[in-house]
Amino acid sequence: MNEQVLVTGGSGFLGMRIISELLKDGYEVRTTLRSLDKKKQVIKTLNDHHIKTEKLSFVEADLSKDEHWNEAMKDCKYVLSVASPVFFDIPEDETEVIRPAIEGIQRILRAAEKANVKRVVMTSNFGAVGFSNKDQSSISTEENWTNQDEPGLSAYEKSKLLAEKAAWDFVKNKDNDLEFATINPVAMLGPSLDSHVSGSFNIIKNLVDGSLKRVPNIPLNVVDVRDVARLHILAMTTPEANNQRFIATADGQISMPEIAQLIKHQRPELATQTSTKKLPNFVLGLGAKFNKEAKEGKLLL
């Protein structure tokens, strides 16, 4: 197979998993890294998992800069836009989180259009879809959008929401043949190829290390990173996927207390500090008035 795919953010939890699946499928893969210092580690990690990397190439490119994106897109049929702007400290002003996310996807779409890329698949998230649906009897679908002024919506979630909206606006307002689709994963867990994990792993970390003395009875939707990677490839290659959004989730929900119980039963050696005592919902509601994490947690009740 000579088709070339660009994957942005190749050193990340999801990005590296997508690269591994594409290489196993026989694609030529190019990936972007903010620094090529990570190139050897990415190759080593993939090789350690018995994945051949002869068809993998690298370009140094940053979502916040115009340089090198034309080079990254050259001869690519597909682009999987996985990377998000990186912040080591979350700025106080949410616009400093939102603006780079919007400008980043616009930068990718402009370069893809210029390079005559066939289709771009963007990694969005479920926070852009279902956080304004308060009716427990109704089902959130790809037709739904979260209200950007939803109380408790974090700057990160808002940045993903507004970046996806900006992407759809770009595609729909352009007179070109660029195809587009989005993947909207819920809490993404599963095995990592290296030490990089998703932000959703903070849920597990806080349960394992005893940070949560009482566990909020929050229902969660989760999805395996391997399924999300495969869904990106299906959205890339399936003709009917053009102009569509796809929620990535496993069947049903699991609560945080249920996750705590699973850790205790399945990995007791990790659960010496794991609490299974439930935090009453009204306490979480009270805490939401003063605590950012509690406010974000209340959003999921």
Annotate each predicted stretch with a short phrase.
Residues 174-178, 190-203, 235-246, 270:
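Glycine/proline-rich active-site loop of Rossmann-fold NAD(P)-dependent oxidoreductases
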Residues 204-213, 218-246, 251:
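Alpha-helical substrate-binding/gating segment
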Residues 231-296:
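Mid/C-terminal beta-alpha module of Rossmann-like enzyme folds, strongest
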Residues 36-37, 46-103:
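NAD(P)H-binding glycine-rich loop region in Rossmannoid oxidoreductase-like domains
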Residues 81, 85, 90-156:
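Conserved Rossmann-fold NAD(P)-dependent oxidoreductase catalytic core, especially the SDR/UDP-sugar
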Residues 150-180:
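Active-site Tyr-X1-5-Lys
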Residues 152-155, 190-196, 214-226:
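Glycine-rich "substrate-gating" loop/helix at the edge of Rossmann-like oxidoreductase active sites
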Residues 4-27, 32:
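N-terminal Rossmann NAD(P)H-binding glycine-rich loop of SDR-like oxidoreductase domains
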